[in-house]
């Protein structure tokens, strides 16, 4: 019997599944910012206090990320990701249920925990299955993530105004709509598990010490790693390179979530209508697509060593422009989007580039996302606190600039070709 197309080209089906999962990792949370005004008015909660709502997924990321790799190793990556998609759908529905505000908060917690699992496991899957095309597939992954987040940001306000029931759909209906792709992603992921020739290997946890999926000659990591250092008592948490990746991940995420949460209220305060303010957030994330897709090109050039440090420079220019020349608001938003998209793609690329094996990539991903999102969770709350304390936007935007400067500093170190859990830090070239 001749193998089916899915069997002969399992990588295509797996790639489609990975990208569809990525399409759900930001859309369910990026729509919150443009709806803060509606949520505040409906629930009677101060808009600045709702910065905590944006921080809850990040806190969940920090708490759950260290567990995700262990769950994948124990139960299989594909099964755990499937469960996370089901939980993501349940959390999205729960968050939109009418009644007590508890539904909003508890549903958001479940959403954050579900996204955290997929965030950690997918980079390890990409490292194993696409080791010869790591930068390109990672860029596509982050582009889908950013693109659907952009779409959600731009449509939630118009959707909230669509007639439905006794009035309009409102913010609850709009947030429910933000999870529209979850059922499709769940089905395609399940189909990929069942029909791919690689289903059994895909469902098996990534090896700890070094049997990544074979690729073209010279592309896969070695099966035996003579430079592999003992993991020691602290494992990846005791590795300096891992802490550099964590810092870079954390500062870029902190800056992004401050901006994506508060950009719409900032635009509204400058006299831009609510719908236009939501489109501004969409514009930020649409422009981040170009930033994400540019990273593979930058990593091939002579400036690859300095790419992590150069990316946040664009963000610094953009935020300075928002402060000094707000009349050019859309232009600064686009520039910041380019920086944020490239920052995210760079961060996810580092999980693979700074690890020799899929197992090491999974541990690095879990550690960096746990600590990184713990840093990021401070951002939206601190931004809202400064806004309430000072009554203006200057101090909060200066906090964003300080965060981007910290990302730049981390980028100076993480750009060096060194890998985690190795006796000799430099990665070297063969």
What are these regions (language model features)?
Residues 64-76, 291-304:
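Helix-to-loop junctions at the C-terminal end of transmembrane segments
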Residues 44, 76, 97-102, 131, ...:
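Helix-breaking motifs and short loop linkers at transmembrane-helix boundaries and internal kinks
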Residues 32-33, 240-292:
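Extracytoplasmic gate region of multi-pass secondary transporters
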Residues 78-81, 305-309:
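Primarily marks hydrophobic transmembrane alpha-helices of the MFS/SLC 12-helix fold
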